[in-house]
Regions:
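S-adenosyl-L-methionine
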Residues: 1-81, 128, 178-181, 188-202
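Glycine-rich adenosyl-binding loop in Rossmann-like folds that engage adenosine-containing cofactors
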Residues: 2-26, 81-129
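Mobile, glycine- and charge-enriched loop segments
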Residues: 33-40, 100-110, 131-142
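Conserved acidic-Pro-Pro-aromatic motif
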Residues: 37, 56-62, 124-202
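Hydrophobic pocket-lining residues within nucleotide cofactor-binding pockets
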Residues: 44, 90-92, 138, 164
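Hydrophobic packing residues within well-ordered alpha-helices of enzyme cores
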Residues: 53, 73, 99, 145-149
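Short "lid" loop at the C-terminus of a central beta-strand within the Rossmann-like core
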Residues: 66-69, 89-93, 166-168
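Short, hinge-like loop/turn segments at secondary-structure boundaries
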Residues: 78-81, 100-106, 152-153, 176-181
Length: 202
């Protein structure tokens, strides 16, 4: 599959409209953020979310493990000064994985499987102490990404937005596990925006 230019974005030759529609939800998430220093975001996909976030936060750190999406991400937002791009997946600890493309027509419909196409790292590995927003749409891997971010979360108590759509159970953790994990450290659900759940610490 190759990249093509559509509506000013370099994208894999599949539908773009769904991502453009979902990014409009950001306006309902931002009011929960009292500060807007750093946002950690995954998956970066082709850059639509990171670019929009870069207009509101001092620094955007985005992660995208899929090779073709990462190529489009760099082409689309690689020149935006406050966006830091990583060709990595997020998890609980260091490892490696490969991408299983569930639906080739959907550039976000992937899942991680055993392999060595990319590295898996924890957010805590980066040592951030100024994260005000954590936004994760990692196709069922949210639970592991949160486990790998517990130190970071407890340093700055960011607003957390997760896309939870019931597919974490394929990795052994249904959505309830992730919700319970965040509630155990003082977070509550403040809003549900389509499939995104916004958590704020009491």
């Amino acid at each position: 599959m190759s990249l093509t230019s559509r509506d000013g974005w370099w994208v894999p030759e599949v539908a773009l409209s769904i991502i453009l529609r979902e990014v409009n939800d950001l306006k309902d998430m931002l009011p929960f953020c009292k500060q807007k220093r750093r946002v950690v975001q995954a998956g970066g996909n082709i850059g639509i979310w990171p670019k929009e976030l870069s207009k509101h936060f001092d620094s955007v750190v985005t992660f995208e493990p899929d090779a073709l999406n990462h190529q489009a991400l760099v082409m689309n937002v690689g020149d935006v000064e406050n966006i830091d791009i990583h060709n990595l997946a997020l998890g609980e600890k260091y490892g490696a994985g490969s991408m299983d493309h569930i639906d080739p027509r959907n550039i976000g419909a992937h899942q991680i499987k055993d392999g060595d196409e990319f590295q898996i790292v924890s957010i805590d590995r980066f040592g951030y102490n100024d994260v005000d927003f954590l936004q994760l749409d990692v196709e069922g891997f949210e639970h592991f990404a949160i486990l790998g971010a517990m130190e970071t979360i407890q340093k700055s108590w960011p607003v957390i937005c997760l896309e939870l759509k019931g597919i974490g159970k394929r990795y052994g953790h249904p959505d309830e596990d992730t919700i319970n994990l965040l509630e155990s450290i003082g977070y509550t659900i403040r809003s549900r925006i389509h499939r995104d759940i916004v958590f704020v610490r009491n």
